[in-house]
Swiss-Prot record:
Organism: Burkholderia mallei (strain ATCC 23344)
Cellular component terms (Gene Ontology): cytoplasm
Gene from which the chain derives: murD
InterPro entries, A to Z: Mur-like_cat_sf, Mur_ligase_C, Mur_ligase_C_dom_sf, Mur_ligase_cen, MurD
Protein name: UDP-N-acetylmuramoylalanine--D-glutamate ligase
Enzyme class: ligase
Length: 504
């Protein structure tokens, strides 16, 4: 369970959901535990004590001295950056002594390897990316279930991977398929994780303070791929395509791509627009086609020896219940992952039609007087808001702002200029947003509260428009979390609905 170590003494840093899961897992397998948290009484301390775990707790600032006294393994919670001023010296001290630093994902990978020695061989699907992870993870899990598999969905989406694994072991019900949502934080401290199929949905600026820069952030995303992992790549994203294996390499892992254009290579996925209908399609070698397919528009001169490609229609994009072109891309990614582990197409396509989406992710919560009110509070970075605007593809009054996390807001300018009737600015980094959008020609208005922004947006919106809460920022400057921000938005929309003589 712990590599070449038998019941090591483990230092667990941070007692959030993941840290608690690691501590319980290690205790379950006979490890001695030292648990440290910068909070003197972290909320999960009582839960760990109640679990009957024997451990030493150290509260307060982290110190390199925490690795003294026989520590053999350091477990790092995903919320803690190893570059942080209070943590970097401790991590350096551990590495100087040859003490491994693992996150929960590495513990999970080691656990699967140990279970594999006894014959357990599940398929593992992993999803990462700046945006769209939760939607794609939930959808991939549903697709695998519809194909008749026993499925466990865990990771960044919650519950913690080790908690889900413990539950499955105790119930003697280990799943056939693991579907994992993974953040860059979780991947950064993984070393042997090697899923059967994995995707990077997109890579745009986010969490630069945690990683120390964009290159390190992108590199962490790339750790989702093992040596033989089938790589499901977004061909519309140049940063993602940097992880495409060299075509000439004889031992290169298999890769398939998805995108919002027509696919041009056998096994790739995309969109075909024909007679006013957008179709989800798969590119197939015409010699292997088993169903009527549309000819590809790819010109023969684009490759020296191009295959004879046809496009197999899977389903109309409008048959998806999740809105926006970005969600069509997420659906293609989920479908590609399920196909990559050998699942049959028919039940997967039924699952695509069934999935209704996740809360706070481009969720239409009301339509009042012809105006859609859209909750995208989970849009906590610039890339998410760009995707929401381009995906909805309708005139919008945008509500944006909050804690910008050091992002560059310039990429918002083009979609705002194209789609927005006006932008309502809120939160700490409203001035930075105003500066980035100043040359768009779109009216900008500052508001002290989200409620005021919603009311002003409603007054400006015309029938056919959307009032879109997609902040491009974190929420903690004004709210407890993004869900609280969404609740405030919904409450403000409910007030407007009541004034119009209706309810949500």
């Amino acid at each position: 369970m712990f590599g070449d170590r038998q019941r090591p003494m483990v230092l667990v840093l941070g007692l959030g959901e993941s840290g608690l899961a690691i501590a319980r897992w290690c205790a379950r397998h006979g490890c001695r535990l030292r648990v440290a948290d910068t909070c003197e009484t972290p909320p999960n301390l009582a839960a760990l004590t109640a679990a009957g775990v024997d451990f030493e707790f150290v509260g307060g600032a982290f110190s390199p001295a925490l690795v003294d006294g026989g520590i053999e393994l350091v477990a790092l919670s995903p919320g803690l950056s190893p570059l942080a001023e209070d943590l970097a010296p401790l991590v350096a001290a551990a590495r100087e002594r040859g003490i491994p630093v693992w996150g929960e994902l590495e513990f999970f990978a080691q656990a699967l390897a140990a279970l594999g020695a006894n014959g357990y061989a599940p398929k593992v699907i992993a999803i990462t990316g700046t945006n769209g992870k939760t939607t794609t993870t939930s959808l991939a899990g549903l697709l695998c279930e519809r194909a008749g598999k026993k499925v466990a969905v865990a990771g960044n989406i919650s519950p913690a991977m080790l908690d889900k694994l413990t539950e499955a072991i105790d119930a003697a019900a280990l799943p056939d398929v693991w579907v994992l949502e993974l953040s860059s934080f979780q991947l950064d401290t993984a070393h042997t994780f090697a899923p059967d199929a994995a995707t990077i949905l997109n890579i745009t600026q986010d969490h630069l303070d945690w990683h120390g820069g964009f290159a390190a952030y992108a590199a962490a995303k790339g750790r989702v791929f093992g040596p033989r992992t089938v790589r499901v790549l977004n061909r519309d994203d140049a940063e993602v395509m940097r992880f495409a294996p060299p075509a000439a390499a004889a031992d290169a892992p298999r890769a398939v791509t998805f995108g919002l254009n027509e696919p041009a290579a056998d096994g790739d996925y995309g969109l075909l627009r024909e007679n006013g209908i957008a179709w989800l399609v798969e590119a197939i070698d015409r010699d292997g086609a088993d169903a009527p397919a549309a000819p590809s528009r790819r010109r023969k001169q684009e490759a020296a020896n191009p295959p004879d490609i046809a496009l197999k229609r899977l389903m109309p994009a409008d048959a998806l219940r999740i809105r926006g072109l970005h969600n069509a891309a997420n659906a293609l990614a989920a479908y590609a992952l399920a196909r990559a582990i050998g699942l049959p197409a028919a039940p997967l396509l039924h699952g695509l039609r069934e999935y209704r989406g996740e809360p706070h992710r481009v969720e239409v919560i009301a339509t009042l007087d012809g105006v859609d009110y859209v909750d995208d509070s989970k849009g906590t970075n610039v890339g998410a808001t760009v995707a929401a605007l381009d995906g909805l593809a309708q005139r919008a009054v945008l509500i944006a702002g909050g804690d910008g996390k050091g992002q560059d807001f310039e990429p918002l300018a083009a979609p705002v200029a194209r789609w927005c009737r006006a932008v309502m600015l809120i939160g700490r980094d409203a001035p930075a947003l105003r500066e980035a959008l100043a040359d768009t020609g779109v009216p900008l208005a500052d508001h002290a509260t989200l409620e005021a922004a919603v009311r002003a947006a409603s007054a400006l919106a015309q029938p056919g428009d959307a009032v879109l809460l997609s902040p491009a920022c974190a929420s903690l400057d004004m709210f407890r979390n993004y869900a609280h921000r969404a609740d405030v938005f919904r409450s403000a929309v409910e007030d407007i609905a009541l004034e119009k003589g209706t309810t949500l």
